[in-house]
Every structure is written in structure tokens, then in C-alpha cells.
């Protein structure tokens, strides 16, 4: 009874999102062109690292505002940590990430940092980041945002763990508890890249676990947040998070 009461209290804290956010949670079918939704995958398959890199290179070639970099490589499988920078500022073709960051920091616009899939078994975050990249390449409404912001999108923080479809790194380490000590090489490289931009807005995307909806009398053991719309905010990530 105690657990059900806690969940009921949590669910009773209604959150009213503005229409700009609510429209993204519509029930109408959505069509995406990212690798996992190309019609060639089984319903339980997600974008592989090879598909992710091919998709990013394709998007980069099609866009005049996207600049594709690597924030580093993973310790085990030596996968790239891809980083997509979107800006209307002129970035020389041979510019390093540090040089590109210096340019965008000097253009007076708000800097946004969007990272995904630190927990690889939360694939909606990573797939959503690829949709976001597609939008900034092909959707006029998204491209218009670049008149006001620069945005960095890191679609997959933990490629080794994504290959294994685990919550942790290859070594079994939860990087979401490592933002201060930076023991994981992947996260240390990510923070090095972040410090180049020092973005004013940071989005760290995850995916809620779904255990099943409640029965009509609210007595099931499920944990369904009926009104949260999969959007949650937290002030920080530190060593004492549990």
C-alpha cells in the first residue's frame, strides 16, 4: 500500500506543458527517417554504431550548418563519440573542435548542449537525438532556431555499452554517477568537449522504464506516470545520486 500511495502522490503532481511541448506527444503516427525506423529493422532493433556514423555523415554532407566531430574514442571497441555542432557561423573545413567552439562562443548566441544515451538500455534517448539531428538538417522550423542558438548534439555517449545493450559501460560502470570524478574515459572526453563550449543550456536525455499501467482501481504493481509526458527536470548530477 505504501508504494502505491507514493506513486499516486507522484502522479497527482500535475504538470501542464505549453502547446509547444505538448504537440510533440501527439497520438498521431509519426514518420522518422533515422536508421532504426527505415523499415529494414525488426521492431526490437535499434541503430547500430555503424548505422549511426553513416547516418551522421549523410546528414553532415546534406547540411550547410552541421559540423561533425569526434569527442574521442571508447576504451574497448574503439568507437567514435560523435558530436554534431549546428551553427550559422562560418566554420572552416579544417577547424578543430576547439577552434569551432571558440567561433560559436563568439557569435553572441545561446549555446545548447544536447546529449543522449548515457544509459544504453534507454534507446529512445539516442534515437530521439538522431531525429533531432535530422530535424536541424531538414526541417525549416528547426533550422530557423539557429538564428538564435548554437546547438551541440551528442547522440550516443556510451557506444560500447550500446553495443552490449547494457545500462553501464563495457566495464560495468554507470557513467551517470561519474560526472564529478570522471573515472570513465568516455565521460572524461565528453566533459573535455563540453568545457570548450560551456553551454548555458544542457539537456541530458534518458528514457523512463515502463512496468505496466495501473488497473482501474490503482492496485497493480506498475509504475506508470500518466501525466509526465516523459519529461523530467533535475538540478544536477552528483556523486551522491542513488
Protein language model regions, located:
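M14 metallocarboxypeptidase catalytic domain recognition
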Residues: 1-242
Amino acid at each position: 500500500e505504501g508504494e502505491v500511495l507514493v506513486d499516486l502522490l507522484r502522479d497527482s503532481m500535475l504538470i501542464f506543458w505549453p502547446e509547444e511541448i505538448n504537440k510533440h506527444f501527439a497520438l498521431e503516427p509519426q514518420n522518422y527517417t533515422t536508421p532504426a525506423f527505415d523499415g529494414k529493422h525488426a521492431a526490437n532493433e535499434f541503430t547500430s554504431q555503424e548505422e549511426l556514423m553513416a547516418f551522421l555523415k549523410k546528414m553532415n554532407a546534406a547540411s550547410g550548418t552541421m559540423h561533425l566531430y569526434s569527442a574521442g574514442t571508447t576504451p574497448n571497441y574503439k568507437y567514435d563519440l560523435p558530436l554534431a555542432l549546428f551553427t550559422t557561423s562560418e566554420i572552416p573545413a579544417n577547424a578543430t573542435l576547439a577552434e569551432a567552439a571558440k567561433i560559436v562562443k563568439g557569435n553572441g548566441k545561446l549555446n545548447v548542449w544536447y546529449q543522449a544515451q548515457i544509459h544504453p538500455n534507454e534507446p529512445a534517448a539516442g534515437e530521439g537525438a538522431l531525429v533531432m539531428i535530422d530535424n536541424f538538417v531538414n526541417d525549416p522550423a528547426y533550422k530557423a532556431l539557429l538564428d538564435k542558438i548554437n546547438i551541440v548534439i551528442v547522440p550516443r555517449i556510451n557506444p560500447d555499452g550500446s553495443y552490449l545493450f547494457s545500462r553501464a559501460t563495457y566495464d560495468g560502470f554507470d557513467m551517470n554517477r561519474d560526472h564529478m570524478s570522471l573515472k570513465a574515459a568516455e565521460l572524461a572526453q565528453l566533459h573535455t568537449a563540453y568545457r570548450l563550449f560551456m553551454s548555458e543550456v544542457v539537456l541530458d536525455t534518458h528514457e523512463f522504464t515502463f512496468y505496466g499501467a495501473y488497473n482501474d482501481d490503482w492496485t497493480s504493481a506498475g509504475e506508470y506516470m500518466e501525466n509526465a509526458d516523459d519529461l523530467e527536470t533535475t538540478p544536477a548530477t552528483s556523486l551522491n545520486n542513488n
